[in-house]
Amino acid sequence: MVRYDPTIYDGAAVHYRYGRPAYSPGLEALLAEELGLDGSGRLLDVGCGPGILTVRLARLFQEAVGLDPDPKMIAEGRRAAEDRGIANITWVQAMAEDLPGAAPGPYRVVTFGSSFWWTDEVRVAEAVHDMLEPGGALVLIMHKAGAGAVPPNPGPPPIPHAEIEALVEKYLGSARRAGQGAAPPVRTRSDGEDVIARTRFGVPRVILAPGLPDLVRDTESVLSGYFSFSWSAPHLFGDRVEAFATEVRELLRARSPEGVFWDWPGDTKVILARK
């Protein structure tokens, strides 16, 4: 049984919305073509966070549902939808393990945007299988750096990730934390396709959608990116959070007086399993 820790992303919701790099600009077209999406049917986005995927994909469906256990993430998702003028999303505060009861189907597509690994994976995948309409799809979506060639630098210096992570370690120690405990181990075998293959879905398809080659971010966006991670969320720093932020800003100013950086989050990996 997965135990939910409500402090995992404490203070991170707004940073998650503004600090995470976007998935491939071709994601909607890829899913529409692969799954025959035509504006009908229902979408369920599990572990939706501040609605990054939910809001992007909602226009491909008649109705979308964003599900997340964190009320602050849900609130950010609502704001994001309102900002974009999207009115066909229902927001549900619940865990993936609460399915199907928390958000009954049927659904044409159920997505997990970098969230599947937080769940009781086999149990949740089997629940999703029952919730999908015939021919529906479970889709895992994530950034995948290193899966393809790195594009040429468009000009600004790259984000100095190693130096920022050294600052995180300086403040928080070498053992990564999440909420009130240790961060989950980094997956070493796959990104979930091995788990899905053990369920009724069988072996999924894996597709790479080209990432943004010329993504440029400013200092505050880079800092928000780090505050959006469970292992460097604001609450972990306690009363030293402003000192950490100041050091990161000083480091970034030294690397780029203009305050802009090139970010290459990688291509977008899509793991697609049909019912």
Residues covered by each model-derived region:
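A short, conserved alpha-helix within the catalytic core of class I
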Residues: 118-128
